[in-house]
Amino acid sequence: MKDLLRQENNEVADITIIGAGPIGLYAAFYAGLRTMKARVVDSLPQIGGQLTALYPKKAIYDVAGYPKIVAEALIANLAIQASQYHPEILTSTQITEIHRNGALFELFSEDGRQFLSKTVLIAAGVGAFAPRKLPMEEAVKWEGNGLFYFVQDPTVFFGKKVLIIGGGDSALDWAMALMANAEVTLIHRRDKFTAHEDSVEKVRKSPANIKTFYELKSIVGKDSPQGKELHKVVIFNNKTNEETTLEVDAILCNLGFSTNLGPIKNWGVEILNNAVKVDVNMATNVTGIYAAGDIVWHPAKLKLIATGFAEAAIAINNAKTIVEPHANFFPGHSSSSKEKK
């Protein structure tokens, strides 16, 4: 992936893609298919978005062609796919302003750099993100010392008694991923899960201990040669107030993320439901600015990597007709275009 990173230049890009997550990387590849000069910028220090920053070792099951693929491997494959067209990719670069200047867009970064582009694609995922944390004052002192909000290295949990908190995809996916090498207890404050039905069914049939209507009340530590370490937790049933004490070595909280669109709200694009509103062409209300992936809202929106790929292709094909007004919207199939080269 290091070979993909390049220094910025002063050339006008046909399209500037804001976000180097899976959708942004696929958009860079697809722009190459349409012979568009692409620039990709991301505020994070590495490509991959949330997949790299939060759960590089997490298995993903709903990407076409892969029965199962680890997040960092998916990003590596997307980087290789995009690299054949040599897009300019700039990490640690946060775009704060976008202004129209004649036929071009001027994009300004937080550190004052200027970039020129004929079109723009916003593929910034959920914007700025941070994990929702436990609403307990005592939880702060355990962060990184037995209490985790995301998983960089799953082997940290191997051979341990792990309490997982949450009812979404991440919570159940990690329960399935860890149960072969750890003793897993999963608690959720309701009996309805927001995860995929298949994941819920698999976890219910697994050796994992599932407790619904339970929440965390307190964390108990003990002294060790290395200092204070996590020892027990007290959980309670939110219907009966019955308390239960569990011995645990680690807590993994998957309570979702707090998101913030940040400067995107000031770019003139219409915002709806804390997302960028687009039409069927993935176009925003600003001509020449498109959006794709989790950052967008439209009536049929599904927040999946699979649908994000399709949205990126739609956006790029439409942007091509702005860069080259006489170009066809539909370029034909990639197999045909490759064979002609």
Swiss-Prot record:
Gene3D superfamilies (alphabetical): FAD/NAD(P)-binding domain
GO molecular function terms attached to this record: ferredoxin-NADP+ reductase activity; flavin adenine dinucleotide binding; NADP binding
Enzyme's top EC category: oxidoreductase
Cofactor: FAD
Co-factor: note: Binds 1 FAD per subunit.
Stated family: Belongs to the ferredoxin--NADP reductase type 2 family.
Protein name: Ferredoxin--NADP reductase 2
Species of the source: Chloroherpeton thalassium (strain ATCC 35110 / GB-78)
